Amino acid sequence: MVKIPCRSENGQVVNIEVSDSVFDRVYNEALVHQIVTSYLANARSGTRAQKGRSEVAGSTRKQWRQKGTGRARVGAASNPLWRGGGKIFPNKPTENFTKKVNRKMYRAGMCTIFSQLLRNSKLVAISEFRVETTKTKFFLQKLKNYQLENVMIITDEVDENLYLASRNVPNIKVVEIDLIDPVSLLSYDNVVITREAVNKIESVLQ
């Protein structure tokens, strides 16, 4: 079992045991890349659209006669080779960008990310993180006790006060276990996780 320090708000530190299979995995860059690209691809709205030569507005008149001008032959102004013409092989909203990753691979990739964060001292465990009011000022004062910036806070469940107090703060994200994703974990300089969230992550990812 791996031991990680768990800090309380008053500065006390207690070592807690965590699962090797979740927090002590060998870093697998290829697997992490696969689950990140899958997440980003599945998040695409797929609404991009371009017009082909048959969809561009304009006359279908031939621009000049076929022979005798010395110039290359040409048809309508919607010719894809001309400026303002249609596009060859235009993108359509019917494209499917979905990339599937098996559940076992996704869980292994998330464990790899958590292990690497702990290895690089970017994962900070705390006893709990709660605020008594929705005022952002009090939330920032509490966060200042841990001396962290650009941080993602993972809790077992987000209470309304914590969510409302933190939502307008730049470079801060508060999320519960069910909503964590690989891109967010890799985007922040520090990841703060509560003790209850550690237990829940172990039960979900093992």
UniProtKB/Swiss-Prot annotation:
**Assembly information from the UniProt record:** Part of the 50S ribosomal subunit.
Cysteine disulfide links: none
Q: Which Pfam families match?
A: Ribosomal_L4
Which parts of this chain are annotated as the region Disordered? 47-71
List, alphabetically, the InterPro entries matched: Ribosomal_uL4 (IPR002136), Ribosomal_uL4-like (IPR013005), Ribosomal_uL4_dom_sf (IPR023574)
What's the name of the protein?
A: Large ribosomal subunit protein uL4
Which GO BP terms sit in this record? translation
List the GO molecular function terms. rRNA binding; structural constituent of ribosome
HAMAP family in UniProt: Ribosomal_uL4_B
